Amino acid sequence: MDNVIFNYYSKITGLNVSRETCNELESLISMILEKNKQINIISKKTCEKDAVRERHIIDSAQIIDFVDLNSNTTTDLGTGGGMPGLIVAIIMKKLKNSMKINLYEKSYHKCVFLKEVSKKLKLNTEVIQKDIFKINNIETGTVMSRAFKPMPIILNLVSCLLYTSPSPRDCQW
């Protein structure tokens, strides 16, 4: 692996990212760019490797400091192309943490992509093809999302999902 690329990943604070993790992140980038030719995984404006590293990978990896490492699961709401969920799963693998990352996405095509990536990189994920707004509750240690919905909607959604509302209709979006 190119030292420039390895040094680039050193921006991920406090993780001492291994070459193996860097290789997996680079594989993820290649898969994103390839699949993006067919379906909209990321914006066309950020379709170059350096832009994907900075705008998506490094940005998504910042959440790792807030993930409850003692929990069995972490949930990514409206994961889209897998950010931040796939990045967290790659980092968890490096940390030898057995936490499962639940990836909620309603798009069939994106779910197929997420499953392919998870299988190829041997990530501990579960891809759940459902509209998160139609789910009554979830059990998870950490909830994360990126570029999903405005913050007030996310906070209301999380409040309803974690505190077992009798019905999604009881919550207001």
Predicted feature locations:
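Class I SAM-dependent transferase core
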Residues: 4, 8-69, 120
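Conserved SAM/SAH cofactor-binding pocket of Class I
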Residues: 61-139, 145
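Short glycine-/acidic-enriched loop or helix-start segments at secondary-structure transitions
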Residues: 86, 154-155
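Hydrophobic pocket-lining residues within nucleotide cofactor-binding pockets
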Residues: 132, 148, 168
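A short SAM/SAH-binding and catalytic strip from SAM-dependent methyltransferases
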Residues: 142-152
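A short glycine-rich, Lys/Arg-flanked "PGG" loop and its adjoining helix->strand segment in the class I
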Residues: 155-162
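Single conserved hydrophobic/aromatic residue that forms the stacking wall/gate
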Residues: 163-173
